Amino acid sequence: RVCESQSHGFKGACTGDHNCALVCRNEGFSGGNCRGFRRRCFCTLKC
């Protein structure tokens, strides 16, 4: 199962999954991607 949480450290519009994933890894997650109408960065973690 994969859990998701919105990134606390990512600032601005999420335009690229790569940058989002890097920020998420710094927050202790396994990765992340941009999602939603407002293009927010969501971090993923196996749970």
Swiss-Prot record:
Function noted in UniProt: Inhibits trypsin but not chymotrypsin.
Subunit structure and binding partners: Monomer and homodimer.
Keyword NADP: no
InterPro entries associated with the record: Defensin_plant, Scorpion_toxin-like, Scorpion_toxin-like_sf
A Pfam match: Gamma-thionin
UniProt key word Glycoprotein: no
UniProt KW keywords: Antimicrobial, Disulfide bond, Fungicide, Plant defense
Positions of the record's site feature: Interaction with trypsin: K11
UniProt organism field: Vigna unguiculata
GO biological process: defense response to fungus; killing of cells of another organism
Domain of life: Eukaryota
Cited CDD domains: Knot1
UniProt family annotation: Belongs to the DEFL family. Protease inhibitor I18 (RTI/MTI-2) subfamily.
Cysteine disulfide partners in this protein: C3-C47, C14-C34, C20-C41, C24-C43
Protein name, UniProt field: Defensin-like protein 1
